[in-house]
Amino acid sequence: MTKRVYRFKEGNAEMKEILGGKGANLAEMTRLGLPVPDGFTISTEACMDYLNNGHSFTTELKKEIEKYLEQLEVSSGKSFDDPENIMLLSVRSGAKFSMPGMMDTVLNLGLNDENVEHLAKITNDEAFAYDCYRRLLKNFCVVFFCFYK
């Protein structure tokens, strides 16, 4: 099976063809020991497979992503299933070349109606928590349902 997902610590700046610019730069910052949250990049090849497969993930890619999500839960000590210890993700698209403002981003993936209340409690800032949730919903709709910004 061809590797399609790379943890940040598995890459470097020379891997822009495989990881895209953002992915390669995150990998390089991790390699240099800079404070980068643990994460992973889905390869450009996997993205091409997705596009060529009728906008559908293969079973193998789904399993690989699930494996990396489980590793993130372990390394972060957080979980999508634990409202007391919420794992929130940033999902960013990237390309080989920098295109500021052209690529999609979804922040705070993992927030929902139940755990946003806990985020408000642990941050002691209800407005902040609900603003994060509002941004998630807005960006999710823009990116996945083609709503206008």
Residue ranges and their predicted role:
Residues M1-K149:
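Nucleotide/phosphate-binding sheet-loop regions of phosphoryl- and nucleotidyl-transfer enzymes
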